[in-house]
């Protein structure tokens, strides 16, 4: 596993040995004092100690926001070499070697801890990247499909609701027209019924008048019948009287004939009696014919009047029956029209109630869909904000990862440097004032602004600010 420095708070043994703190952070200049492992040669070999001081600074640049590391060698000091005839202080070298081994052991432990922390950090970064990818896919899915589908469903349902409203409006208009037509028919039938009632009343009045006339005609007929009976009785009485007179005349004629026979000298009375008889018979026949003619004329007049009255009565009765049938038919038709009107009014009320309930349901559905759309837009905006935050965190983590990668590469290159033998340690220590005067860090702040409206990205702007620390 690679070894790297990842914390600026740890206490290194470099402070005890070299007096400096090899600490670094993302926002401050990073320095890593590197020194080679000391080694002792033979007496005839020359040894030298080289101390190199590097300054590693992170410079953020470019559109991607990734930092680059720049390492510069501050200086190097080389210890004077000793010849073969010079003596070495082994006690000093031994002490330095022991302290160096202790320092390396502490560094290994610290690097192990840093490696564990770095592995945890990488796992966390991977987890955040997975969450970021899932959220990005969710945002893309919501942005690309759901709003348009919801809008299509909303428009389709609105079109269906409008079509149903138009159908119901047309049905209501048609029912209103039918109701108006039925009301007109009902008014016309009522007017016709009133006319028929008036005609019935007139017919009843005429019938009452006809009944009075019939009664008068009946009384007149009865009177005439009584008169006819009286006349018949009178005619019979006159016949009897006439017969009596004839018998008396015949008797008188017989007596006169006897007297004539007895008295031939008397004038002939037979011719006179015959003349008188013929005269009386003529008068009687004339009276009888006149009476019969008067009786027949009176009877015919009464019969004609009775027939006329009977015809009028029969016609009145027939008209009354027809009027009764018409009144019954009109009454049945009015009852049927009333039932039809009641059923149509009931259907119209039911249609109005159903239309009102469906309209309220459609309004509730519209409000619910609008609320769902607002909720989806708010959720989309929240996902976009989270996505933007995760994107910013990812960019910052990418910068830190790049920095750690550079640090790890630098540390590996430092560890893999060839170890030279040395006889004495001589290093160059730079003061904080000198390091401060030589170290410059360039800090780049990238501000990314995303404007959303109703859950959709309207504009996106990126701004970079450079600061030199």
Swiss-Prot record:
Record bears the keyword Isomerase: no
Region (Coil 2B): 295-411
Gene Ontology molecular function, alphabetical: cytoskeletal protein binding; identical protein binding; structural constituent of cytoskeleton
Domain of life: Eukaryota
Keyword Ubl conjugation: yes
GO cellular component: cardiac myofibril; cell tip; cytoplasm; fascia adherens; intercalated disc; intermediate filament; neuromuscular junction; nuclear envelope
ADP-ribosylarginine sites (modified residues): 58
Positions of region (Coil 2A): 268-286
Region (Head): 2-107
Function: Muscle-specific type III intermediate filament essential for proper muscular structure and function. Plays a crucial role in maintaining the structure of sarcomeres, inter-connecting the Z-disks and forming the myofibrils, linking them not only to the sarcolemmal cytoskeleton, but also to the nucleus and mitochondria, thus providing strength for the muscle fiber during activity. In adult striated muscle they form a fibrous network connecting myofibrils to each other and to the plasma membrane from the periphery of the Z-line structures.
Subunit structure: Homomer. Interacts with DST. Interacts with MTM1. Interacts with EPPK1; interaction is dependent of higher-order structure of intermediate filament. Interacts with CRYAB. Interacts with NEB (via nebulin repeats 160-164). Interacts (via rod region) with NEBL (via nebulin repeats 1-5). Interacts with ASB2; the interaction targets DES for proteasomal degradation. Interacts with PKP1. Interacts with FLII.
Protein name: Desmin
Gene: DES
